[in-house]
Protein backbone atom coordinates (compact mmCIF):
# COMPACT_ATOMS: atom_id res chain seq x y z
CA UNK A 1 0.00 0.00 0.00
CA UNK A 2 2.79 2.44 0.88
CA UNK A 3 4.39 1.78 -2.50
CA UNK A 4 1.13 2.67 -4.26
CA UNK A 5 0.90 5.93 -2.31
CA UNK A 6 4.49 6.75 -3.22
CA UNK A 7 3.82 6.09 -6.92
CA UNK A 8 0.83 8.45 -6.89
CA UNK A 9 2.73 11.17 -5.03
CA UNK A 10 5.71 11.06 -7.38
CA UNK A 11 3.44 11.13 -10.45
CA UNK A 12 1.65 14.23 -9.12
CA UNK A 13 4.97 16.06 -8.77
CA UNK A 14 5.32 15.93 -12.57
CA UNK A 15 2.61 18.61 -12.77
CA UNK A 16 4.84 21.07 -10.89
CA UNK A 17 7.00 23.41 -13.02
CA UNK A 18 9.49 26.18 -12.30
CA UNK A 19 7.96 29.44 -11.09
CA UNK A 20 4.76 27.91 -9.74
CA UNK A 21 2.99 28.57 -6.46
CA UNK A 22 2.26 25.07 -5.17
CA UNK A 23 -0.22 23.92 -2.53
CA UNK A 24 1.18 21.11 -0.38
CA UNK A 25 -1.48 18.74 0.90
CA UNK A 26 -1.66 16.79 4.13
CA UNK A 27 -1.85 13.05 4.72
CA UNK A 28 -0.10 9.78 4.04
CA UNK A 29 -0.18 10.03 0.23
CA UNK A 30 0.43 13.78 -0.04
CA UNK A 31 3.49 13.14 2.15
CA UNK A 32 5.23 11.45 -0.78
CA UNK A 33 4.36 14.33 -3.11
CA UNK A 34 5.98 16.78 -0.68
CA UNK A 35 9.04 14.52 -0.39
CA UNK A 36 9.39 14.42 -4.18
CA UNK A 37 9.11 18.23 -4.43
CA UNK A 38 11.87 18.49 -1.83
CA UNK A 39 14.04 16.09 -3.84
CA UNK A 40 13.50 18.06 -7.06
CA UNK A 41 14.43 21.33 -5.35
CA UNK A 42 17.63 19.80 -4.02
CA UNK A 43 18.67 17.71 -7.04
CA UNK A 44 17.13 19.51 -10.02
CA UNK A 45 17.10 23.11 -8.81
CA UNK A 46 13.31 23.34 -9.06
CA UNK A 47 12.22 26.87 -8.16
CA UNK A 48 8.78 27.21 -6.58
CA UNK A 49 6.97 28.85 -3.70
CA UNK A 50 4.74 26.60 -1.60
CA UNK A 51 1.79 27.09 0.73
CA UNK A 52 0.87 24.39 3.22
CA UNK A 53 -2.39 22.94 4.50
CA UNK A 54 -1.39 21.99 8.05
CA UNK A 55 1.26 22.42 10.72
CA UNK A 56 2.37 18.84 9.97
CA UNK A 57 3.04 19.64 6.31
CA UNK A 58 4.72 22.93 7.25
CA UNK A 59 7.17 21.01 9.44
CA UNK A 60 7.85 18.48 6.67
CA UNK A 61 8.38 21.23 4.07
CA UNK A 62 10.73 23.19 6.33
CA UNK A 63 12.78 20.04 6.85
CA UNK A 64 13.13 19.72 3.07
CA UNK A 65 14.04 23.41 2.62
CA UNK A 66 10.97 24.10 0.49
CA UNK A 67 10.39 27.90 0.30
CA UNK A 68 7.09 28.74 2.01
CA UNK A 69 4.60 31.60 2.06
CA UNK A 70 1.27 31.87 3.83
CA UNK A 71 -1.91 31.61 1.76
CA UNK A 72 -2.53 35.33 2.40
CA UNK A 73 0.79 36.25 0.76
CA UNK A 74 -0.20 34.84 -2.65
CA UNK A 75 -2.96 35.86 -5.07
CA UNK A 76 -3.55 32.33 -6.36
CA UNK A 77 -2.09 28.83 -6.32
CA UNK A 78 -1.03 27.24 -9.62
CA UNK A 79 -1.50 23.66 -8.49
CA UNK A 80 -2.44 21.99 -5.20
CA UNK A 81 -1.88 18.28 -4.62
CA UNK A 82 -3.63 16.60 -1.71
CA UNK A 83 -4.93 13.22 -0.62
CA UNK A 84 -8.53 12.12 -0.10
CA UNK A 85 -10.21 9.60 2.18
CA UNK A 86 -12.94 8.63 -0.30
CA UNK A 87 -13.63 9.59 -3.93
CA UNK A 88 -16.86 8.74 -5.77
CA UNK A 89 -17.50 8.36 -9.49
CA UNK A 90 -18.78 11.96 -9.72
CA UNK A 91 -15.47 13.36 -8.38
CA UNK A 92 -16.92 14.26 -5.00
CA UNK A 93 -14.75 13.35 -2.04
CA UNK A 94 -14.43 13.13 1.71
CA UNK A 95 -11.32 14.66 3.24
CA UNK A 96 -10.26 15.51 6.76
CA UNK A 97 -9.19 12.19 8.21
CA UNK A 98 -6.02 13.96 9.30
CA UNK A 99 -7.97 16.89 10.75
CA UNK A 100 -6.75 19.52 8.27
CA UNK A 101 -9.95 19.93 6.23
CA UNK A 102 -10.42 23.67 6.82
CA UNK A 103 -6.92 24.67 5.74
CA UNK A 104 -7.07 22.17 2.87
CA UNK A 105 -10.26 23.75 1.53
CA UNK A 106 -8.89 27.28 2.00
CA UNK A 107 -5.84 26.41 -0.14
CA UNK A 108 -7.83 24.41 -2.71
CA UNK A 109 -10.28 27.24 -3.44
CA UNK A 110 -7.84 29.69 -5.15
CA UNK A 111 -5.99 26.85 -6.94
CA UNK A 112 -5.97 26.89 -10.74
CA UNK A 113 -5.52 23.13 -10.73
CA UNK A 114 -6.52 20.86 -7.86
CA UNK A 115 -5.24 17.28 -7.87
CA UNK A 116 -5.91 14.38 -5.52
CA UNK A 117 -3.50 11.49 -5.07
CA UNK A 118 -5.00 8.25 -3.77
CA UNK A 119 -4.53 4.51 -3.83
CA UNK A 120 -7.29 2.45 -5.43
CA UNK A 121 -8.83 1.51 -2.06
CA UNK A 122 -10.15 5.09 -1.76
CA UNK A 123 -12.42 4.79 -4.81
CA UNK A 124 -16.08 4.17 -3.89
CA UNK A 125 -19.44 4.11 -5.65
CA UNK A 126 -21.02 6.29 -2.95
CA UNK A 127 -19.44 8.34 -0.18
CA UNK A 128 -20.11 7.74 3.49
CA UNK A 129 -18.39 4.57 4.69
CA UNK A 130 -15.57 6.85 5.87
CA UNK A 131 -16.79 9.03 8.73
CA UNK A 132 -17.49 12.59 7.58
CA UNK A 133 -15.50 15.18 9.57
CA UNK A 134 -17.26 18.40 10.51
CA UNK A 135 -15.14 21.18 12.02
CA UNK A 136 -17.00 23.20 14.66
CA UNK A 137 -16.10 26.13 16.90
CA UNK A 138 -15.53 25.13 20.51
CA UNK A 139 -18.22 27.52 21.77
CA UNK A 140 -21.55 25.75 21.48
CA UNK A 141 -20.03 22.53 20.15
CA UNK A 142 -22.33 20.43 22.33
CA UNK A 143 -25.34 22.17 20.77
CA UNK A 144 -24.16 21.21 17.30
CA UNK A 145 -23.41 17.67 18.50
CA UNK A 146 -26.93 17.25 19.88
CA UNK A 147 -28.43 18.61 16.66
CA UNK A 148 -26.54 15.95 14.69
CA UNK A 149 -27.61 13.32 17.21
CA UNK A 150 -31.29 14.23 16.80
CA UNK A 151 -30.89 14.03 13.03
CA UNK A 152 -29.57 10.45 13.32
CA UNK A 153 -26.08 11.24 12.04
CA UNK A 154 -24.32 9.21 14.79
CA UNK A 155 -21.85 11.95 15.77
CA UNK A 156 -18.71 11.50 17.85
CA UNK A 157 -16.16 14.07 18.95
CA UNK A 158 -12.73 13.22 17.57
CA UNK A 159 -10.20 12.53 20.31
CA UNK A 160 -6.44 12.37 20.56
CA UNK A 161 -4.53 11.13 23.61
CA UNK A 162 -7.76 10.94 25.62
CA UNK A 163 -8.66 14.58 24.96
CA UNK A 164 -10.83 16.22 22.35
CA UNK A 165 -8.80 16.73 19.19
CA UNK A 166 -8.14 20.41 18.46
CA UNK A 167 -7.39 21.50 14.89
CA UNK A 168 -4.66 23.93 13.83
CA UNK A 169 -7.41 26.58 13.81
CA UNK A 170 -8.34 25.68 17.44
CA UNK A 171 -11.66 24.04 16.58
CA UNK A 172 -13.17 20.65 17.43
CA UNK A 173 -14.07 17.94 14.92
CA UNK A 174 -17.32 15.99 15.05
CA UNK A 175 -17.20 12.83 12.92
CA UNK A 176 -20.50 11.65 11.44
CA UNK A 177 -21.02 7.89 10.90
CA UNK A 178 -23.43 8.14 7.97
CA UNK A 179 -22.67 4.83 6.18
CA UNK A 180 -23.85 6.28 2.87
CA UNK A 181 -24.40 9.84 1.61
CA UNK A 182 -26.98 9.64 -1.18
CA UNK A 183 -26.62 13.28 -2.25
CA UNK A 184 -23.26 14.79 -1.21
CA UNK A 185 -24.02 18.19 -2.73
CA UNK A 186 -27.33 18.62 -0.89
CA UNK A 187 -25.83 17.31 2.36
CA UNK A 188 -22.88 19.69 2.06
CA UNK A 189 -25.30 22.59 1.62
CA UNK A 190 -27.24 21.45 4.70
CA UNK A 191 -24.06 21.45 6.80
CA UNK A 192 -23.08 24.87 5.44
CA UNK A 193 -26.20 26.32 7.07
CA UNK A 194 -25.60 24.89 10.55
CA UNK A 195 -24.52 27.69 12.91
CA UNK A 196 -21.27 26.71 14.62
CA UNK A 197 -20.01 24.62 11.71
CA UNK A 198 -16.82 26.17 10.34
CA UNK A 199 -16.30 23.69 7.51
CA UNK A 200 -16.99 20.07 6.57
CA UNK A 201 -15.07 17.33 4.81
CA UNK A 202 -17.24 17.11 1.70
CA UNK A 203 -15.18 18.42 -1.21
CA UNK A 204 -17.84 18.38 -3.92
CA UNK A 205 -16.89 18.92 -7.57
CA UNK A 206 -13.73 20.78 -6.60
CA UNK A 207 -11.06 18.44 -7.95
CA UNK A 208 -9.66 18.62 -11.51
CA UNK A 209 -7.64 15.40 -11.61
CA UNK A 210 -7.46 12.26 -9.50
CA UNK A 211 -4.23 10.26 -9.66
CA UNK A 212 -4.93 6.68 -8.65
CA UNK A 213 -2.20 4.15 -7.92
CA UNK A 214 -3.23 0.50 -8.13
CA UNK A 215 -2.07 -2.95 -9.13
CA UNK A 216 -2.16 -1.91 -12.79
CA UNK A 217 0.03 1.13 -12.24
CA UNK A 218 -0.92 4.80 -12.07
CA UNK A 219 -4.09 6.09 -13.75
CA UNK A 220 -5.12 9.75 -14.11
CA UNK A 221 -8.81 10.64 -14.27
CA UNK A 222 -9.93 14.15 -15.24
CA UNK A 223 -13.23 15.61 -14.02
CA UNK A 224 -15.55 17.79 -16.10
CA UNK A 225 -14.22 20.75 -14.14
CA UNK A 226 -10.64 19.85 -15.11
CA UNK A 227 -11.33 19.52 -18.84
UniProtKB/Swiss-Prot annotation:
Enzyme class: isomerase
Binding of substrate, residues: 26-29, 82-85, 95-98, 122
InterPro entries with a match to the protein in the record: NagB/RpiA_transferase-like (IPR037171), Ribose-5P_isomerase (IPR050262), Ribose5P_isomerase_typA_subgr (IPR020672), Ribose5P_isomerase_type_A (IPR004788)
Gene Ontology molecular function, alphabetical: ribose-5-phosphate isomerase activity
Active site: 104 (proton acceptor)
Biological processes, Gene Ontology terms: pentose-phosphate shunt, non-oxidative branch
Pfam families: Rib_5-P_isom_A
Cysteine disulfide links: none
Domain of life: Bacteria
Known role: Catalyzes the reversible conversion of ribose-5-phosphate to ribulose 5-phosphate.
Subunit comment: Homodimer.
Protein name: Ribose-5-phosphate isomerase A
